[in-house]
Amino acid sequence: MLVVTTENIPGKKYEVLGEVFGVTTQSKNFVRNIGAGLKNIVGGEIKDYTKMLHEARMVAIERMKQEATEKGADAIVMMRFDSGSILQDMQSVVAYGTAVKFIED
């Protein structure tokens, strides 16, 4: 399924089917917390957290695409991400956009 961050897809006309979302919440594990604590002292990228957030974004995108497929969509336009912390040890990621169905001229 085509997913774009733009409002339009060049050369395509479509009808809007509605909003679609994909959500995931990841928890930090004990080992990651130890490594993050050490990095916090010396500075630098916390690669385990970066990997966790990347994986969370991919899961959120796949869930959003699944919802769009269930609506009969051909593509998703205006895709965006939102994220936030839940308590101290959890990170929530949302992918959202507008599901569209291509129409012929």
Curated annotation (Swiss-Prot):
Pfam families: YbjQ_1 (PF01906). InterPro entries: UPF0145_dom_sf, UPF0145_YbjQ-like. Belongs to the UPF0145 family. This is UPF0145 protein LSL_1614. It comes from Ligilactobacillus salivarius (strain UCC118) (Lactobacillus salivarius).
